[in-house]
Amino acid sequence: MLRHRNCLCEKTFKLVRLTSSRQRVLSFGFLTISPSNSLMEPKKSFNFLVFVVALSYIFSLYQVLALTPEGIILYALLFLLNFVFAFVVNDTAIAIKYLFVLMAMRAINLIYSLPLDEDAIRMFAGYRLLHGVNPYLPMPTVFNHYDVPIGLRTLTEYGGFVERLIYPGLSVFAGVAEYALGYVIFNVVIYVTFILISYVFLRNKSTEALIFAVLWLLFGGVNLATLLLTVGILLRKYNGFFVGLAISYNQLYTLIAPFLVIYYLAEGKKEVLRQVAYALFGFLITNVPFMVWDFKLWFSAMLYSVSQPIVPIGFSISRETYMGFFPIPFKVYEYLFITMYIASIVIYAIMFKIVAKWAYVFPAISMIAYPRTLLGYITSWLPPAFFFFFTRTEGNVKVAKLKPLGTAVLIAIMIMPIFVPALTSTDVNTPFTFKVTKVYVGTYGNVYKMSINATVYSPTVKNITFVVIPDFYPFYNTYLWWSTVNVTVGQNYFNITPLAPSQEIGFNNATYTVVGVYGPYYYFVTLVLVSNGTMFSNFTYTPKE
């Protein structure tokens, strides 16, 4: 059966076929198969392709669990149709089209949902720049000022995330556009532009881009950095310049640099110097204005962010650690990530000739310590860098052609859903508000209970988790106090206590942050406890212009 599927896949995809008197090579998206490459024999390669596609489905479906039942049913239906056509009917071409439908629906959810924390940071930077204020501030200060333009923030902000990621220059300028035009409009423009560029690449360079684009969008959507790297793919001689621009948009792209240097060393030292110079130029042109404005402030922000690893809060055991289920310090995840990442670079450098075609695998290995990063950022830098920069086919490439009708259907499937309502976002991300009405302090000044008054606006909110973060020890939180059940629309009153009856959060005369979590979002309340057990709640800070 597997042998039959391999033959069928080879006939159906017809992505890139190279013929010579001695060898025949078939390239699937990011896998190159040839008789001379024992690591990429057809059976293993096809199974790996199926595994990656299935993994993308799992991640994509997992992300919609906070959506409405209608949205979950829609995603499940698309997944079922794709599975049937791919593995039951054995019509891979139709399966690809349904894959694009699923990708498009995923993009709808991204476009019409509220911004991520990184987007909110950029919008705040754009807000300050539009008002003539230097946008470069330490991250804790940024979120003390946080009052624009949305009130929702994600779990990644506590535990160290926002204190360790500052916005580079291009991100600031993008934030101006996002704030002035609105995030939704800006994201739609990016999405459409990416589709057009991908289509040009698809028709004129290699139809490998078909599977690549699907997986790219299924995992993490499209942002400005992915567009920049796509342009860099089209203009390969200037890869470094566009990588530099991508780093100026999101510093996570610095993870590419060591692998790129090793890769270009194979082409000679001059090529390394040329690409590094391009990257520096691309990074500096958007950062020079802020360097001139206040170099010390800009430099301290850049140095602070790159010297502090990002804490991996997300859809993983690290999230449960953050929520208080596992008493594991966040430093464990940081050290694990750093160790695996460095090991990947060393292995790649030592075994370059053997593993050059598999370079994209190594960052994924290091992301085991960062499941949320793997989910959210894998397509921001991994596929464009390690598919197009490393897994290159050899010889004369004959580009497969799409029939006119198939091309029209493909474009319609990809673009049309942008202009319809967000079917999977109905009644999602509706905020709830809460305040702490009383804090209970024991005989010895220990806090053992809090009373919460929460107002819920959406019937889809079924569960709220309250987390208490002591400001005096914010990076090792073991205080998940209570998770609610059967939440109703309107007023809800809760008494939250530690998970363990003997556990107490801390002591009197200290400052705490209470986080009310539902789905991936929360509102925050800052508490100031005083000796008699009273407190100030709902603390806000208006940004100064």
From Swiss-Prot:
Keyword Transmembrane: yes
Keywords noted in UniProt: Host membrane, Membrane, Transmembrane, Transmembrane helix
GO CC annotation, single: membrane
Transmembrane region(s): 48-68, 69-89, 94-114, 181-201, 209-229, 242-262, 279-299, 336-356, 368-390, 404-424, 510-530
Keyword match Repeat: no
Primary location: host cell
Subcellular location: Host membrane
Membrane topology annotation: Multi-pass membrane protein
Protein name according to UniProt: Putative transmembrane protein ORF545
